[in-house]
Amino acid sequence: MKLPIYLDYSATTPVDPRVAQKMSECLLVDGNFGNPASRSHVFGWKAEESVENARRQVADLVNADPREIVWTSGATESDNLAIKGAAHFYASKGKHLITSKIEHKAVLDTMRQLEREGFEVTYLDPTEDGLITPAMIEAALREDTILVSVMHVNNEIGTVNDIAAIGELLRSKGILFHVDAAQSTGKVEIDLQKLKVDMMSFSAHKTYGPKGIGALYVSRKPRVRIEATMHGGGHERGMRSGTLATHQIVGMGEAFRVAKEDMAAENVRIKALSDRFYKQVEHLEELYVNGSLTARVPHNLNLSFNYVEGESLIMALKDLAVSSGSACTSASLEPSYVLRALGRNDELAHSSIRFTFGRFTTEEEIDYAAQKVCEAVTKLRALSPLWDMYKDGVDISKIEWAAH
């Protein structure tokens, strides 16, 4: 077993060797290096063929028409293109948008920008389990609502929203529905022939593909129109100009092909790893699981260890690559806005650690990690006067601290 151990698969995944191999064939002079937009020679034709093959592979994972897949630089760009693109195109119909308080920053900050442009946004509170329900959305709908954006799988707590039910509601009202699915490809079944979803964002690097490439699904039936945010040569049917990065695109296609092939078996394996980890730490007192225990992907275990500071726990776990709730918006030491939205108090939000497991995680790594977590939590609590007070039966929430 090699140290340190990577348990931060929701931040990024390593590229699968099968993906790296395919990518390497699109770079050198004796490889498939041409510009897919070069129509006058075989180098361009070959590159275009590879790009279209990858488009099919991405579409196949989510059961879409390849013509509905638009290449972007990643899920952040896909979210921007979908939300700004649709809001601007349909602004004459209304200027009200709906999203949730626990979306990824790529959605929240895009919404904030649209607010500055004169749109109105309703931000929904999730349930304490971290879910957004169709009833919440229905209650927030207005005559001038044109777009709702709700994520499929949450990046911090791994909860899975019922996008099928939300889609049915919104389609019946004629309101556009965008879903950020960066965290769900290869983990949750997605069938866009059945789902009433108008736009869906994808990322390669959360699914064992390269960074810097993503895609946006834009429905053809019913036809969804969006305004481009990137202008130039008119690539991707005018929705996203810029020379296509063949090696990145081929990598994303292969990653999604592998995901489709391996998903069922991989989910079973990762569920077993996650359960194995939890069984070894659940004896710890004052341990809280953040997010629904049932409506979540097995890859994510977000735990709060009360009376332990998340940052100090991360430092104590120097051989484990994990992230703390407060590090999800990395630069700030604010407690996680996702956990705060679930109603967790600052102390619990600050004591959270996100463990995310993946394709290359082993049982040996899980056992080592669980042992280290138990040791570190026990040691840090032994140093904590608050833990002593809790053990003595003092209700810490009732204490009035003197101001300094």
UniProtKB/Swiss-Prot annotation:
Principal EC category: transferase
Enzyme Commission code(s) on record: 2.8.1.7
Modified residues (N6-(pyridoxal phosphate)lysine): K206
Database matches in InterPro entries: Aminotrans_V_dom, Aminotrans_V_PyrdxlP_BS, Cys_deSase_IscS, Cysteine_dSase, PyrdxlP-dep_Trfase, PyrdxlP-dep_Trfase_major, PyrdxlP-dep_Trfase_small
Residues involved in pyridoxal 5'-phosphate binding: A75, T76, N155, Q183, S203, A204, H205, T243
Keywords: 2Fe-2S, Cytoplasm, Iron, Iron-sulfur, Metal-binding, Pyridoxal phosphate, Transferase
Reactions mediated catalytically: (sulfur carrier)-H + L-cysteine = (sulfur carrier)-SH + L-alanine
Molecular function via GO: 2 iron, 2 sulfur cluster binding; cysteine desulfurase activity; metal ion binding; pyridoxal phosphate binding
Active site feature: C328
Location of the protein in the cell: Cytoplasm
Obligatory cofactor(s): pyridoxal 5'-phosphate
GO terms, biological process: [2Fe-2S] cluster assembly
Keyword hit for Membrane: no
Any single Gene Ontology cellular-component annotation: L-cysteine desulfurase complex
UniProt-listed Gene3D superfamilies: Aspartate Aminotransferase, domain 1, Type I PLP-dependent aspartate aminotransferase-like (Major domain)
Pathway connected to this protein: Cofactor biosynthesis; iron-sulfur cluster biosynthesis
UniProt subunit comment: Homodimer. Forms a heterotetramer with IscU, interacts with other sulfur acceptors.
UniProt similarity note: Belongs to the class-V pyridoxal-phosphate-dependent aminotransferase family. NifS/IscS subfamily.
Free-text function comment from the UniProt entry: Master enzyme that delivers sulfur to a number of partners involved in Fe-S cluster assembly, tRNA modification or cofactor biosynthesis. Catalyzes the removal of elemental sulfur atoms from cysteine to produce alanine. Functions as a sulfur delivery protein for Fe-S cluster synthesis onto IscU, an Fe-S scaffold assembly protein, as well as other S acceptor proteins.
UniProt name for this protein: Cysteine desulfurase IscS
